Amino acid sequence: MMTTSDDFNSRRVLFHSSNNSRSSSRNERKSLTLRANAASASKGEVSLLDYGAGNVRSVRNAMQKLGYTVKDIKSPEDILAAKKLVFPGVGAYGSAMDILRERKLIEPLREYVLDGTKPFMGVCLGLQLLFDGSEESGGVEGLGLIPGTVTKFTGDDLIVPHIGWNVNEVKRESYLIDLQKDDPSSASVSERVYFVHSYRALPNENNKDWVLSTCDYGSEPFISAVQKGNVMATQFHPEKSGFTGLKIFDQFLSGGKSEMETSSALPSSASSDAVRKGLAKRVIACLDVRSNDAGDLVVTKGDSYDVREKSEGESGDVRNLGKPVELAKKYFDMGADEVSFLNITGYRDTPLKDAPMIDVLKLSSETVFVPLTVGGGIRDFTDSNGKHYSSLEVASAYFASGADKVSIGSDAVEVAEKFYANNEQGDGTSSIETISNRYGSQAVVISIDPRRKYETDPKNTKNKCIETKRKLGPNGEKYCWFQCTIKGGREGRDIGAYELAIAMEKLGAGEILLNCIDEDGQGNGFDHELVKMVADAVKIPVIASSGAGHPRHFSEVFGAVPACSAALAAGIFHRDEVTVKECKEDMAKSGLPTRL
């Protein structure tokens, strides 16, 4: 028998009191411990090698949250003088090596690691750069400290980038990585941590002494962490791996003496390998942000993109559902796998002068240690003084403020139109191309805002049509395509979501955020037909959005469209109608790989 929304909501209070209290208490204890660390005297100094690419702010915030003083590397001499050195690599391999070479940091970095007497930790690209080289960027030499070449993931059915929460198979004893403690059969399996990368290093006979852990994704396990004495590096991002990641940083910085507790008992429904292991399906909390009529930045939510209150048919104030920074922290504590900020009036604002949005990112990154995405206004623009800014400059400002990914909406539609007009070729100047070339494809999310466009005959449009079984047209039409819109859904264009997604993947985007204007705020579940059509068209991750009204809607879209990597909701979380935990419990009961 199907559970109604009223039945579900009537049981929520009991569910929360019995099932959420322990989780809330654990998170409160962790937060109290972190606040105490940050407030106490410094535990010591750690040097940070920030070469100016991507979001390094979160690494800095994590170490400061743990009670350490962070010193920036400003010269080659600073590397050799460092007591502890953290090297968070972000972006493309070639760009990173070019910057290190220009700043004359390659040789001192090699000397520091080869010496091995002082602690070193590389993160993500900071691990890859330790190898001989990479096939990325047309083939580039690395630091040559670990034997092997970094190569791209392969496999016809593999979704690349590898984005999300996965487990490590730990090969030998180390204080760096915690294991799952609640299942004896998982004695060598770590808690889930956050990965985002398209290239990986493979274990071989020449580097086996370095390999601390591997991760399964694709045709063969790749190296997820290395350690030799005081030298350590991870392919995953500890600073984006919640309390588990903070514990890893604390273990590194304290030499294995961390007292943080991160493991929690998983429910019996999560005991199967299918739930515990493998790349987890992600639950993303989205905050639609805009200024209200008083000029305050608020989180809002609408129906079919209309965010104003209604009173006797008239438009009222912007619907206010809370403060962005507070809600982001709330969702992190609840277990959201990512948090997304969408500035829904960004298409008409001047992004680099949007100080409140920049401040939201900076403040959120101090307390939210999962990936942050920001969207709205990522485009080239000229301000009122005639000064021109590129989309790359806009994205760079967001990355420097704490964002891990940028979401591009209206500009992507116009870029795709030019792409098809130019015989399916990019010109190298678009926002998608310039940002992905600098920061990597994983940093670029394409937000598609389509609505159903019905046709009596699929031949009436150049765009891909489907025969719909979900909802017929107003005159009984059984064919439809999904028309892309710009300007917050106000203007439709003659290009479909299918065509847009294909163009964006070819131009270098790393992820698709697939909204649906027809289902926005309706609570009827995600549009499986739309999600399947786009997920089948590309080999990059697809995020389902718009329509969630019940925890089962998340399980249903993942079951109906196995290629769907994540699902996103906003209003149901803001109004406390559904919690992130409830969605994940339902996913685990359905046997889906879930981070709990």
Label each residue range with its predicted role.
Residues M1-R22:
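N-terminal chloroplast transit peptides
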Residues K84, V90-N166:
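Cysteine-nucleophile active-site neighborhood
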Residues T234, K281-V289, V339-F341, L372-G376, ...:
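Hydrophobic faces of well-ordered beta-strands that scaffold small-molecule active sites
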Residues L266-T367, N423-S430, T434, R438-I446, ...:
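Conserved N-terminal beta1-alpha1 strand-loop-helix module at the mouth
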Residues N343-G346, L392-E424, C516-G521, A544-E582:
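Glycine-rich phosphate-binding active-site loops on the catalytic face of alpha/beta enzymes
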